């Protein structure tokens, strides 16, 4: 676990109504089962080689740009519109890490194909895809797309938070990242929690999210730079009120909506 070094500033940017929160919470109360956390299927994770292709003049970025993007019903139908898919790919290229919600495709070639569109201009992105979450026909997948030239992911530390009591509709996807630097021992590390709350039960799920956060900060890696990001299904005021009630302070944030 590394602290923020003097040369790097993390700029947290939420897209389309996503918000980012950060704090350290107290002990977990046991309602979410951390012992049954599920790893994301490794068969769905590409890019086993974590070494980025760099020029000899590689310079670590001074800023990491992290975004959240809820793409409603992101499937083959939507991606068949070339204009839409080109815009989505172009947006993602502007960031170092993008948390995606709303993937609804059972075609295992869908996400790799989207990745190829992101990289068709020479970009070097990879992704981590979580399992199907939700109930019955109301299911989706979460993903992280990231620029492997600026960040790397610990795939062994990626998991979906288990919810044995079914308190949250879409179980969050958690991933541990590290900024790529010339000295890996001083690199900034951080954990992202990709969430989409049920708009019908937002109040109840916001309460559950407090427990989810506690599980994540209590992980064995003891990473204390933890960010919640995604679609919280509430407006800024509602989210800030919730955060304040648990002692969580929102970060500086921008939205496109």
Where are the language model's segments positioned?
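Divalent cation-coordinating acidic motifs and surrounding scaffolds
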Residues: 2-257
């Amino acid at each position: 676990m590394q602290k923020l070094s003097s040369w790097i500033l993390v700029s947290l940017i939420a897209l389309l109504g996503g918000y980012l929160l950060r704090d350290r919470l107290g002990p977990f109360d046991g309602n979410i089962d951390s012992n049954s956390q599920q790893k994301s299927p490794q068969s769905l994770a590409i890019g086993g080689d974590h070494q980025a292709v760099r020029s000899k003049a590689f310079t670590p970025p001074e800023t990491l740009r992290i975004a959240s993007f809820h793409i409603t019903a992101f499937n083959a139908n939507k991606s068949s519109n070339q204009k839409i898919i080109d815009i989505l790919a172009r947006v993602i290229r502007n960031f170092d890490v993008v948390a995606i919600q709303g993937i609804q495709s059972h075609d295992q070639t869908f996400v790799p194909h989207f990745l190829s569109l992101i990289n068709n201009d020479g970009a070097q992105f990879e992704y981590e895809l979580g399992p199907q979450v939700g109930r019955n026909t109301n299911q989706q997948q979460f993903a992280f797309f990231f620029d492997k030239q600026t960040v790397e992911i610990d795939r062994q530390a990626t998991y979906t938070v288990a919810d044995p009591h079914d308190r949250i509709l879409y179980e969050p996807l958690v991933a541990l990242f590290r900024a790529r630097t010339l000295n890996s021992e001083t690199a900034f590390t951080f954990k992202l929690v990709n969430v989409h709350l049920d708009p019908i039960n937002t109040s109840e799920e916001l309460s559950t999210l407090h427990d989810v956060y506690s599980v994540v900060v209590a992980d064995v890696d003891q990473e204390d730079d933890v960010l919640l990001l995604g679609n919280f299904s509430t407006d800024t005021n509602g989210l800030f009120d919730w955060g304040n009630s648990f002692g969580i302070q929102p970060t500086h944030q921008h939205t496109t909506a």
